């Protein structure tokens, strides 16, 4: 299934269970792309769309296939079994843990344990889709505020992407890594989401 096909399923669920209107949607990584698509397609209405340091990659299909095929054999066992089997990957992870304090461990814990029900094809589809996000530019929906949790440590190019895809994003800068706010500071993350939904941000 494609991103638009999956978005249609989300829209149908919101139509059926919420009358086509929701207060807010949050997504990080690929989930942020879904939030953007929900806003852009205008088939449902949300008051707030919140993206958690999504990268909004738009790689060419060929490059995305190559990256997916290269990384999937390393990443899929982590998703399926909840642990790293590759010695090389384990070594790199240990190095990153020592360099970055609790972030790497918290991020791994946020991913959760083993998911034996996730198929390799599903993982491949998600990884590939995350690399070829089909988002239009300057998304601007009356009555919808787009908020972005911008982790400054992921790089300045991401601010340009956010401003490319959204006409008036409210960017919340944090001197953090990708999804570090959610992984390491969940209380701060929850308070920020609450403040946004109460119109305080």
Place the predicted regions along the sequence by residue:
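Active-site loop/oxyanion-hole signature of alpha/beta-hydrolase fold enzymes
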Residues: 1-26
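Gly/Ala-rich beta-loop-alpha elbow adjacent to hydrolase catalytic centers
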Residues: 26-35
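Short, hydrophobic alpha-helix immediately C-terminal to the catalytic nucleophile
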Residues: 36-40, 190
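Flexible "cap/lid" loop of the alpha/beta hydrolase fold
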Residues: 40, 48-78
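Conserved alpha/beta-hydrolase catalytic His-Asp/Glu region
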Residues: 60, 82-139
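Conserved serine/cysteine hydrolase catalytic core
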Residues: 121-164, 181
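Catalytic histidine neighborhood in serine/cysteine hydrolases
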Residues: 166-179
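Catalytic histidine-centered segment of alpha/beta-hydrolase-like enzymes
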Residues: 176-189
